[in-house]
Amino acid sequence: MKILKGLIVFICVLNQSCTGQPSQKINGVSFVASNDAIDVSHIHPVINVHANYAAIMPFGFIRNLEHPELSFNSERQWFGERKEGVRQYVETFREANIQLMIKPQIWVWHGEFTGHIKMQTEADWKTLETSYAKFILEYAALAQELQVELFCIGTELESFVENRPDYWNDLILEVRKIYKGKLTYAANWNEFEHTPFWDKLDFIGIDAYFPVSHSKTPTVEECLVGWEKHKPSIQNLSREYNKSVLFTEFGYRSVDYSGKVPWESDRQKGLVNLEAQNNTTKALFEMFWEEEWFVGGFVWKWFVNHNHVGGENNTMFTPQNKPVEQIIKQYYKK
C-alpha cells in the first residue's frame, strides 16, 4: 500500500498537483480555423513563441439571438470548424507535442453577442437545450477519443446560463460521463462572478477583456493600477471554490485606447498603436503569470498562415508579426 501511495504522489508531481493545478503554466494560443488542413509547418510559429497549448475552436451557427437550433458540422463550414477538421488539427498538434483544449463556440449571424442569446418561449428553450447538448456532447466525445487535456463546455453564454441553470448542471454531468479530462467554461469578463456552476468544473474560465485604462497609449504601470479593481474579485472566487483560474481568452488590439474597451473587435475603429498593445499585454502577464492560483491562458488569436497575417499595420487582436509577439514569447519561455 505504501508503494502504491508513493507512486500516486510521484505521478501527481510529474503531471500536475492532485488538486488539478498543472505544474507548468498553460501558455496557450487560440488557433483560428481555416478552410484547409494544416501541417507541422503551420505549428512552427506556435512552437517558436514557446506556447505549450492550443485551443481548437469548432463552431456552431445560430440564425439570431432568439433562434433555438444550432447548425454544425455542415459542409458549408470551413474545414477547421467541422469535426473532421478538429480531429486533423488535434492530431497535427500532437505531432508537435502541443497540448490541447477543444472549445466549441457559437456564432450568431451578423456577429451578435452570444451572451444575449435568450429564448422567448419554454418550447424554444427546450429545443435550444437539446440542440446545444448535441453540439457539446459530440465534441466532448471527440475530445475523449483524442485524449485532449481540456474541454470547454461553452463560451460567453450569460443569458443562457442565467435562465437555465439546472440545464447546465445536467449538461456538465452528461459531459463527465463521456469525457474524463479537465473541464472549464469561458465566462465573459463581466459574467464570471455569477456563473453558478464553478464547483462542478475543474478551472474557473474567464475571457479576460477587463477594462484597465482610459489612455490613448497606456503605460504598463497605469494598466497594473487598472487591474487592481478587478484582480481581487478574481482571486476571491478562486479561493471560494478552491479552483485555479484560466484565462480562456486574453489579449488586446494594437490600437489607440486598447485597454479601454478590450472586447471591441470592430475593424473600422481605432488607429494602429503597437505600444498600447505591448503595454496592456505586459501588464496582464506581470499581474497574473506568477500567481499560484492562476493556471495560465490562451492568447486571442492565432492564425494558420503566420507569414501572411498580423504585422505592424494591423489593428486587430493577433500578436503575429508585431512587437507584442516577442513579449508573449518572453513570458511563455519562463
Predicted segments, located by residue:
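Sec-dependent N-terminal signal peptides
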Residues: 4-14
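Boundary/entry segment of secreted carbohydrate-active catalytic domains
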Residues: 19-48
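The substrate-binding groove and active-site-proximal loops of carbohydrate-active enzymes
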Residues: 28-33, 69-83, 121-131, 154-162, ...
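Substrate-binding cleft and catalytic face of glycoside hydrolase catalytic domains
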Residues: 52-68, 83-161, 257, 300-305
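Aromatic-lined carbohydrate-recognition surfaces of secreted/lumenal glycan-active proteins
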Residues: 102-106, 152-161, 169-193, 242-250, ...
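Aromatic- and acid-rich polysaccharide-binding/catalytic face
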Residues: 136-155, 187-225, 244, 248, ...
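Active-site clefts of carbohydrate-active enzymes
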Residues: 159, 208-220, 237-278, 300-315
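Aromatic-rich peripheral "rim/lid" segments of glycoside hydrolase catalytic domains that contact
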Residues: 262, 266, 278-281, 287, ...
